Amino acid sequence: VHSFPANTIYRLYLDPANNMWAGSIRRGLIGIKNVYACSYQNVPFGNLYGLSNQTINSFFQDSDGIVWVGTDGGGINRFDPVSGTFKHYPATKYEKVVSIVEYTPDELLFFSFNKGLFIFHKKTGQIRPFVLIDKEMNDQTCINGFSVNIQRITKTKILFSAQHIFIYDMVTRKFDIVATMGEEYERHSPLIIATKGAKTYLSDLKNICEYDSSEGTFRTIYQG
């Protein structure tokens, strides 16, 4: 009898090929198909056949099918499902990558816990800081012991979930604050459930909220 290789799952991701990816705590990355499941665990840094850290915080799959894995202290890992191999990046080696999204076709935007937001170049593996509004707001938001959750909600807009809900317009390079903790929602850094069309759903572990990008409105749709 074969049992599931992990007890605690932190993230789930269903890719376009209907494969389920489970990011576990201390048991690595688990790929699940209708017929089998395979797991990948940590290996020495730079090894092609495993993760740089066995706790997974986040995923993103790009248009080429590459899965970008955010680990808890081992930075960003690139996983090629076709070859079954990984690539680790020295510039992100010790980062705790809480959330990760596409920024441009060649770049990713990620949040490193208690360190800040960074843009990662997929080809060079180098990173550079991304400032949330200005230095004061960036430090208040990103270096305070809380997570910042990120979601690409349209082709040109990114949502940041923290003590405020920020919307970044990639064309104008301007931010809007559309909600604030203690007013529109109760707890810090609501988890982003999903984006469906113009609507993005979030949970602060008590209530469920909705941001409508077509109207620019934020509201609570379920009170727990």
Segments the model singles out, each with a brief description of its role:
Residues 1-224:
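Carboxylate-rich, polar loop motifs that coordinate divalent cations or form catalytic acidic clusters
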